[in-house]
């Protein structure tokens, strides 16, 4: 159970309604919880308590999925998944294990993220991204020159900034989720592992298709 109250569907601010339609259809998750990925879905009505916070968070989701991003989506997802593990958020870790599949990361690599240092499945830049993520989340941002030099060997300055911003943002989301006991972080004694559920709904293609359906529905007045 979440530690603070949630906003019911009829009381949402207008900008949130489209997002709720995308994720929940016509359901009110405070009454009928659940998402396609198997999560309760209480993150959304909790964040909706403060409309500006909700809108800011949603804008962050749109930012990392934007076609304007230079960073390889696979490197991004490795960082997002690992930072969920680092901060102990089952929600972030589980959701991004699923998201890894939508960008073509192999099951072998996904299963190796928790123990990446002992694994041989990651290449040089992937290992650097995972090491950099650990520095951001576990070492308060202190990064060795060796790790950073490996990043600069493979990534542009723009890509490094995108990686840093996105990973740090998802570290924050994991911390918030744990503090407020949202989603899969409701039980602080749970094991840190992926929760079974569909991953296709997290793909960019699925999101674009659902948004098109919602826009067409609004235009038709249904």
Feature locations, PLM:
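Histidine/lysine/aspartate-rich catalytic loop segments that bind and position anionic ligands
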Residues: 99-123
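Helix N-cap / loop-to-helix initiation motif
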Residues: 71-72, 104-108, 156-157
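C-terminal end-helix/capping segment
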Residues: 101-106, 177-208
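Conserved alpha-helical segments that form or flank metal/cofactor-binding pockets of metalloenzymes
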Residues: 53-56, 77, 83-108
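Short amphipathic alpha-helical segments at helix boundaries and their inter-helical linkers
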Residues: 32-33, 90-97, 117-132, 161-183
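Short alpha-helical scaffolding segments that buttress acidic/His motifs in well-ordered protein cores
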Residues: 44-47, 57-61, 78-84, 113-114, ...
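Acidic/histidine-rich alpha-helical segments that form the ligand environment
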Residues: 125-165
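Secretory/endomembrane lumenal or extracellular ectodomains immediately following the signal peptide
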Residues: 1-71, 193-222
């Amino acid at each position: 159970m979440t530690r603070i109250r949630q906003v019911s569907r009829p009381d949402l601010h207008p900008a949130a309604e489209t997002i709720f339609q995308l994720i929940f259809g016509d359901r009110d998750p405070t009454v009928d919880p659940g998402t396609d990925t198997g999560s309760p879905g209480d993150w959304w009505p909790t964040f909706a308590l403060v409309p500006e916070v909700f809108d800011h968070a949603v804008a962050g989701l749109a930012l990392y999925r934007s076609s304007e991003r230079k960073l390889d989506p696979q490197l991004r997802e490795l960082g997002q998944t690992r930072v969920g593990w680092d901060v102990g958020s089952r929600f972030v870790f589980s959701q991004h294990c699923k998201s890894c599949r939508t960008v073509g990361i192999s099951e072998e690599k996904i299963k190796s993220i928790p123990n990446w240092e002992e694994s041989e499945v990651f290449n040089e830049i992937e290992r650097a991204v995972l090491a950099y993520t650990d520095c951001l989340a576990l070492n308060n941002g202190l990064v060795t020159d060796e790790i950073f030099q490996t990043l600069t060997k493979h990534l542009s300055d723009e890509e490094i900034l995108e990686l840093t911003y996105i990973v740090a943002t998802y570290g924050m989301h994991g911390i918030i989720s744990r503090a407020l006991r949202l989603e899969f972080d409701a039980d602080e004694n749970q094991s840190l592992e992926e929760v079974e559920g569909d991953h296709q709904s997290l793909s960019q293609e699925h999101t674009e298709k659902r948004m098109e359906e919602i826009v067409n529905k609004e235009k038709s007045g249904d």
